[in-house]
């Protein structure tokens, strides 16, 4: 641009010089030219300023264009860098994934190699066991070759028993545990509900009764001349009359509660009457017998009313009343029967069974005990026969006869009666037994346990309500111990008579002892 300006200025000066040379003589023209020159110089200066301004604007535009292109170039570089970083990151991730995949494959191969090594060791052990078993079989075959047929048969039986005993015991335990858990939950709820809703007095066996006397002089009159009164009294009543130094008291002793009650009533009437001689004793004895028969009938009716069942035959009511004067392990049999009926009724109601049938069979379940000293047979069978004779339904008869497992049950109510009987008998304090029976039962329990194979020791504890059995730990495994406990409990049920429930516990203990010196 500067060159262009200089060219223009040069041309202008040339023209002016030409004009000056032509019109040298013409001052006016010179003056005009001078003026034109000045104007031209001013115009040149203005043009120069415009040119400078245009150059400046051009420079600014070029600078702006340069900055724009530079910014676009930077943005393009930034974009390319981002694309490069993204591709690099993706490649790094792919490399990392491939690396992890290779590591996993290496680990998998290492694990497979380890498993193969273990399998190899296991196969080697099995191979050794097979070789050992082959040697044992060879030895056994040599032994069997020398045996008789019976001896070989016994060996095979023993091997089969040892081989499958554990498997059978395990299966038995699984089934037993499953059904026990389910049944115990519901049975526990039903029995607990029945016990909570019923409570009765604890009874004890009493073999004596006392009669109060107005004065000690009455003792001599009771004895009579040469003891004839006391002999007559004891002969008629079948009791023993104990007269000692205890003031104003006479004791009547007998194991038969009915005889003892008749004797007590007879003696009380004799003392109240004051006339004591053999004829009067016989008269009042007969009167007491008649009164006690009426009392027995009333007691039977009251029992039926307490239980809340339909009236049975009159003879059955009388037999129920007689149970008032019978005891079993010290427990009043009539009160026990009422208690069993209440338990059976409540549990039948909870289970949705026939409440009337359960109560009726439960109340009559010990009916045979009223006549078991007169009729041969177990009281359960005899009781069922009596109930059948006096018109009771077959279901009631079956429940009576089943309650000691002497026949098969026909109805769920029969099983319920047996359970209620056991529940009443096992209630704490409900029953007691003589020392002789107790010792015999303890010995019998321990003998049954010791009769089983691999039993080392057996102890009956908690008054015979628990049997603890110590077995040989190297011969009996846990599963077999479970089956052993079951088998012993079955033997006890079959061979031992006992009130309540006996818990059988098998203990398998192995101790390893070492000494450091």
From Swiss-Prot:
EC number: 3.1.-.-
SUPFAM superfamilies for this protein: Eukaryotic type KH-domain (KH-domain type I), HD-domain/PDEase-like
Superkingdom, natural source: Bacteria
Keyword terms of this UniProt record: Cell membrane, Endonuclease, Hydrolase, Membrane, Nuclease, RNA-binding, Transmembrane, Transmembrane helix
A Gene Ontology BP annotation from the UniProt entry: mRNA catabolic process
Pfam family of the protein (one): RNase_Y_N
HAMAP family found in the cross-reference section: RNase_Y
Assigned protein family: Belongs to the RNase Y family.
Protein name in the entry: Ribonuclease Y
Record organism: Petrotoga mobilis (strain DSM 10674 / SJ95)
